[in-house]
């Protein structure tokens, strides 16, 4: 009966699977009643299938109808795919890290970081609860070098302000730990994350724990009189340790955000293989290779510029020269200022260069200005280059680059105003937030130009990716075919 009318057979084969098509044609031969077709389809368990399916060219030896269910038809995809909720959680947690970086900057600007002289990760969660406890805490602070040399004039009420600034900063850090660790364990145990993502989460958890130790290591450098004497410094934290603390926070932020964006992108690809394969072709284009390298370079420049800003904050170098574009009356400070022998600790002066580059406030400010100029011109040059190559650059990546151009312009303006207005707390804090915003835009841009992971790519290209119809339409077409004479 099948070969009696091949034209009708071809129409039916385009809409039914190998099994359902054979059963349906037998039913058509026996009866033209659509209820019989429904019974046969119900036996093959396709009646209840309401998801979209792909139409493939007809072949008597191959299926024309194949549902896509990751957990059954493609177990490899199940192992590679991570839940969207994991991505949203990671991006949300990265937002908390962004907030604590800004709060840490405020703690530094208000000189509150050394107000808590002990590190108690668990018992230090609660602040002093009564007058007696406050007085005991104040006595501990009075024994610190900062109080003896800088803050001997403050009273208990003033101490409470700087104490709460540091306490909130530490409490926020503990909250991030809980918000990250507990859901990470849940997602891993419930198998909502792939092995690839589990490795990332494990690394981020270790980095988060390290950040807590680095924070106390930094604070201790401002409480130890011997270290202050060795640095010939006033009671303040080491600029090296401050920058390390800042850099660790930046790495933690980047790791969370990058992983979250990657998960969202891969979920989108699995949902729409057609669009994914089209994007793969663009990303495989050799013409986009230079832009991919440029995106990584911009990410590195943004990070290094922010770290040089950390050195400026650690040395209070923002107050050295408060003019722009010149530094004082010159375009550049004198060589004697830049390479001051007073910063050497060796008799042979072999540490002259690196000591001044990292410890001389004048030189450190010049380095930060130079990094800022490099960052701005690099983004500007990349933006101009991308406009010429916009035909080969994905639209979302081009949008991210436009945003980056705006952010770097705003950040440069904030930096100039911060210097001219003698580093007011409000401007300096916004400037620090701008550094992280610039890093964010460069990271998003780089992630959008990144090629897909090979395992995920291999899964995507095997998914059904032609035109789609629904099972309801299949039944409708089968009914029409059944009513036609054979």
From Swiss-Prot:
Membrane topology qualifier: Multi-pass membrane protein
Record keyword Transit peptide present: yes
**Outcome recorded upon mutating residue 236 to R:** Converts to human ortholog residue: No effect
Give GO MF terms, alphabetically.
Answer: metal ion binding; oxidoreductase activity, acting on NAD(P)H, heme protein as acceptor
Give UniProt keywords alphabetically: Heme biosynthesis, Iron, Membrane, Metal-binding, Mitochondrion, Mitochondrion inner membrane, Oxidoreductase, Transit peptide, Transmembrane, Transmembrane helix
The principal location of this protein is: mitochondrion
- The source's domain of life comes to Eukaryota
A GO cellular component term found in this entry reads: mitochondrion
Pathway linked to the protein: Porphyrin-containing compound metabolism; heme A biosynthesis; heme A from heme O: step 1/1
* Segments passing through the bilayer: 86-106, 171-191, 201-221, 244-264, 294-314, 365-387, 403-423, 425-445
- The enzyme's first-digit EC class, named in words, is oxidoreductase
Membrane: is it a keyword of this entry?
A: yes
Recount the UniProt induction comment for this entry: Positively regulated by intracellular heme B levels via transcriptional activator HAP1.
Q: What is its EC number?
A: 1.17.99.9
Q: Which reaction does it catalyse?
A: Fe(II)-heme o + 2 A + H2O = Fe(II)-heme a + 2 AH2
Q: Which cofactor does it need?
A: heme b
Q: Which Pfam families match?
A: COX15-CtaA
**Residue range covered by the transit peptide:** 1-33
What InterPro entries does the annotation carry? COX15/CtaA_fam, HemeA_Synthase_type2
Q: Name the Gene Ontology biological process terms.
A: heme A biosynthetic process
**HAMAP family this protein is in?**
HemeA_synth_type2
> What family does this belong to?
Belongs to the COX15/CtaA family. Type 2 subfamily.
In its UniProt entry, what is this protein called? Answer: Heme A synthase COX15
């Amino acid at each position: 009966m099948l070969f009696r009318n091949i034209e009708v057979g071809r129409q039916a084969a385009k809409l039914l699977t190998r099994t359902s098509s054979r059963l349906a044609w037998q039913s058509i031969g026996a009866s033209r009643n659509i209820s019989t077709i429904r019974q046969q389809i119900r036996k093959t368990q396709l009646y209840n299938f309401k998801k979209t399916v792909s139409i493939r060219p007809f072949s008597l030896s191959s299926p024309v109808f194949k549902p896509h269910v990751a957990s059954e038809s493609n177990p490899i995809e199940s192992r590679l795919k991570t839940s969207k909720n994991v991505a949203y959680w990671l991006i949300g947690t990265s937002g908390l890290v962004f907030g604590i970086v800004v709060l840490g900057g405020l703690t530094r600007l208000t000189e509150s970081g050394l107000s808590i002289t002990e590190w108690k990760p668990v018992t230090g969660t609660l602040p002093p609860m009564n007058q007696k406890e406050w007085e005991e805490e104040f006595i501990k602070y009075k024994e610190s070098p900062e109080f003896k040399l800088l803050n001997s004039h403050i009273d208990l009420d003033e101490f409470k302000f700087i104490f709460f600034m540091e306490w909130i900063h530490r409490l926020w850090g503990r909250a991030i730990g809980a918000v990250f660790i507990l859901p990470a364990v849940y997602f891993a145990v419930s198998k909502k994350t792939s092995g690839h993502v589990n490795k990332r989460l494990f690394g981020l958890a270790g980095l988060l724990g390290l950040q807590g130790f680095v924070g106390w290591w930094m604070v201790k450098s401002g409480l130890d009189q011997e270290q202050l004497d060795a640095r010939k410094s006033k009671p303040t934290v080491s600029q090296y340790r401050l920058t390390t603390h800042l850099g660790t926070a930046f790495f933690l932020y980047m790791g969370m955000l990058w992983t979250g964006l990657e998960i969202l992108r891969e979920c989108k690809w699995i949902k729409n293989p057609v669009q994914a394969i089209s994007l793969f072709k663009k990303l495989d284009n050799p013409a986009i290779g230079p832009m991919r390298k440029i995106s990584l370079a911009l990410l590195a420049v943004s990070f290094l510029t922010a770290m040089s800003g950390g050195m400026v904050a650690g040395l209070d170098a923002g107050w050295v020269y408060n003019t722009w574009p010149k530094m004082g009356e010159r375009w550049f400070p004198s060589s004697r200022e830049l390479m001051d022998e007073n910063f050497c600790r060796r008799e042979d002066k072999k540490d002259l260069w690196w000591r001044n580059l990292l410890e001389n406030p004048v030189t450190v400010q010049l380095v930060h200005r130079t990094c800022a100029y490099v960052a701005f011109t690099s983004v500007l040059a990349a933006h101009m280059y991308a406009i010429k190559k916009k035909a080969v650059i994905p639209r979302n990546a081009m949008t991210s680059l436009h945003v980056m151009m705006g952010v770097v312009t705003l950040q440069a303006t904030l930096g100039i105003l911060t210097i001219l207005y003698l580093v007011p707390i409000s401007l300096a804090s916004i400037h620090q937030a701008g550094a992280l915003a610039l890093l964010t835009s460069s990271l998003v841009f780089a992630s959008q130009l990144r090629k897909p992971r090979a395992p995920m790519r291999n899964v995507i290209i095997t998914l059904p990716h032609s035109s789609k119809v629904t099972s309801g339409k299949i039944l409708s077409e089968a009914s029409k075919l059944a009513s036609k004479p054979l």
